[in-house]
Amino acid sequence: MAKLALIEREKKRARLVAKFAAKREALKAIVEDQSKSEEERYEARLELQQLPRNANPTRQRNRCAITGRPRGTFRKFGLARNKIREIAFRGEIPGLTKASW
């Protein structure tokens, strides 16, 4: 089980990403638009740098919804591999069966 502080930090990052997503996209569009003047693009780049670091989606980490485990997390379920195994054996994930051949 991950520390609660780490899990809360990830939740805070997710909120920041959602909060600044529209502004971030608008600024990135200005920076990448070649028809804009150099000064406008430079100002947009400076403004983009002023956004909080944690507003960048690449700083987010996928974590297990139950344990908070950062590694071995399946995006489809939002769970770590060991929790998927436990829940699947109990039959709580519809359509998921153990492989046999």
Swiss-Prot record:
GO terms for biological process: translation. Gene3D superfamilies: 1.10.287.1480. Pfam families: Ribosomal_S14. Binds 16S rRNA, required for the assembly of 30S particles and may also be responsible for determining the conformation of the 16S rRNA at the A site. Coiled coil: none annotated. This is Small ribosomal subunit protein uS14. GO terms for cellular component: cytoplasm; small ribosomal subunit. Part of the 30S ribosomal subunit. Contacts proteins S3 and S10. The keyword Metal-binding does not apply. It comes from Burkholderia cenocepacia (strain HI2424). The keyword Ribonucleoprotein applies.
